[in-house]
């Protein structure tokens, strides 16, 4: 008798990720995610853009109302690309929306950035190109470290 090997069907695909926000910052985030080579961008969620538009070739899927459908399809990862310069509450609201819908926001570190092994990055941290996070630094949830920024040793951000 020939046995056929079967594998379990997992409830989600850890390589699929959505980008929440389609503005200017999203272009830097999309490029960072692509060159990282870990995730496949499923699309953009943006409450102020039309479904079918695209940002750097990634399709706009709709607004926050699409999150339950994406979750049902097995997408669990998200990156917050809403800037909110001068008003962190805008970014924080997006993190709450994503968490309430069951999504996880992993840290994203551009391959040209360097994070020392003793540094700690919390959920949703974005470390963009040419940045450096030094020894024993702590970078708090959702922090955006823009291009070419240095976070020195023992700093708490």
Regions found by a protein language model. Name each.
Residues 59, 104, 150:
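Residue-level detector of anion-binding/catalytic polar loops
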Residues 69, 86-87, 134:
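Short glycine-rich, flexible loops that bind phosphorylated cofactors or substrates
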Residues 80-108:
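Glycine/small-residue-rich loop that forms an oxyanion/phosphate-binding "nest" at active or ligand-binding sites
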Residues 107-157:
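Structural signal for interior beta-strand "rungs" in well-ordered beta-sheet cores
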Residues 2-82:
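A solvent-exposed beta-alpha-beta segment
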Residues 28, 89, 116:
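Residues that form or flank phosphate/diphosphate-binding pockets in enzymes
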Residues 59-62, 96-97, 124-126:
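Short, hinge-like loop/turn segments at secondary-structure boundaries
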Residues 30-32, 91-94, 139:
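Short amphipathic alpha-helical segments
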